[in-house]
Amino acid sequence: MEEQLKQLEQEALAKIEAAASLKELNEVRVAYLGKKGPITDLLKGMGKLSAEERPKMGALVNNVRENVTAVLESKAAVLEEAAIAEKLASESIDVTLPGRAIKVGNRHPLTRVIEEIEDLFIGMGYEIAEGPEVEKDYYNFEALNLPKGHPARDMQDSFYISEEILLRTHTSPVQARTMEAKKGESIRIICPGKVFRRDNDDATHSHQFMQIEGLVIGENIRMSDLKGTLDTLAKKMFGAEREIRLRPSFFPFTEPSVEMDISCFKCGGAGCNVCKSTGWIEILGAGMVHPNVLEMAGYDPKKVSGFAFGIGAERIAMLKYGVDDIRHFYTSDTRFLSQFERTEA
């Protein structure tokens, strides 16, 4: 049995030495020291030996097992160190390589249009005013000369939350709130923000869109002041060569009311698909603040006057950037948005 032990030990040590990986080394351990390994079998067979042989053979078998175990652990440490070194070498980083540029985004076209309009009016002495998107019926309609039952309310199908609360259909309530708070003082504001209407979404309509309204109130404010303001806006957004025209219209909160058109920037008036062969493009609605609106806010229409206008940000962006479907602005499609990187100022 001693010869058998020496032979097993030599075989085990040789295979340990030949093992090139931790996996191979573990296979050697299982083969010789596992539950079914020969060294384990020898230990199990100790009971068959005589009382005189058992102590001597027990010591020999334990010595062989301890020696093989020690060599296994030593070899495992060497292989683990080699594996770590190999992994570090494969994952090394060349710090002299140039860094990879991070892909950065850019401003959304609607944001850019709104900021451009805000910058223009701030430069003209206007302030930016904001108000709640969930609004009272009074400020959304009644304070703007739209009492309950007024037929013009049907023009703006609304999202009502309760009988007296709704999602605002325009940013005009901000104007009504500002007039009420100013208590007869002069006003020069623009009111950008989201508005909501019960429209069916299509290429030119959305149930939610961005609107920018303007309001000026003071002494001797005339229609000529409104025209000059709108002319400045048109030239800023669509080019210095643009001309404007004002057409009579109707809005309950202004009197007189007008629609503003600009000369077509694509065909120069010759007629094209953008202007529908008219040479003019409709841009926005405006007018002089109705005396009833002034009175409800605490102003004396005999002493002060004012003008107001409303701009659809999507409308301006669609014309400015040649977008044919309003829904593109809301899809977060990078294929659409990335093209505006080239036009970033």
UniProtKB/Swiss-Prot annotation:
SUPFAM superfamilies: Class II aaRS and biotin synthetases (SSF55681), tRNA-binding arm (SSF46589). It comes from the Bacteria. Its cofactor is Mg(2+). One of its GO terms (cellular component) is cytoplasm. It holds the Pfam family Phe_tRNA-synt_N. Belongs to the class-II aminoacyl-tRNA synthetase family. Phe-tRNA synthetase alpha subunit type 1 subfamily. This is Phenylalanine--tRNA ligase alpha subunit. It comes from Lysinibacillus sphaericus (strain C3-41). The lineage of its organism: Bacteria, Bacillati, Bacillota, Bacilli, Bacillales.
